[in-house]
Amino acid sequence: MKISNFSKTAFYAFLLSGNFVFFTAVAQTQLENPALKIYRATPAKINDLVNTKLDVRFNYAKHYLYGKEWVTLKPHFYPTDSLTLDAKGMDINQISIVKNGKNVPLKFLYDSLKLRINLDKKYSSAENYTVYLSYTAKPDQLKAMGSAAISDAKGLYFINSDGADKTKPIQIWTQGETESSSAWFPTIDHPSQKTLEEISMTVPSKYVTLSNGKLVSQKPAGNGLRTDTWKMDKPHSPYLFMMAVGDFKIYKDKW
């Protein structure tokens, strides 16, 4: 069947008018919502998270977390001899590169928000390396603004830690979305990063712990304490790291 020039012209005119209506609608939406005009770029990737291992204890009176961390990374593409981690409002005690089972100290700069670490050499994208950090997180002293949905961004919450309010349970829990996990452990705190996870929590023996993945061990830690280790073997974003400690009840079922 032969299509006339008139039909072709009408068809193209229809397409053009449809595109015009679409672009007009988009432009109108942007005028109505100025937030849509903001260009939200993904941060450049210099290093990729591979695995994050944490060993944490809590000071209920001061609302502190005492942490040890072994974070394994690799350069994203280009070789690099430096590493930048998000770490909000912490005391940084030690940073080392793990070499043959030994910790070799590294030089670093810290401005209360970012850790800039000089590695021991330049690593290629085919090489993994592990950095050890010893730190204290102080979430209640962190002055960070949240969003309309979540009014603050301190990441780690101590609930009725002294037991003074008899109507509230004593609990600890985290809320990391979208970039608040770096208030309780140093990391590259962006949803585009993905890492495996292992968390060991030392808590009073009377409490139950919750975290990502599977509970792989529970060991007495002396003085009425117990260390629980949770392990997640699926890569996930840092904001999904989760801890909860409290007088929870455990229910088990099979199906």
Feature annotation, model-predicted:
Residues 26-255:
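Acidic/His-enriched low-complexity segments
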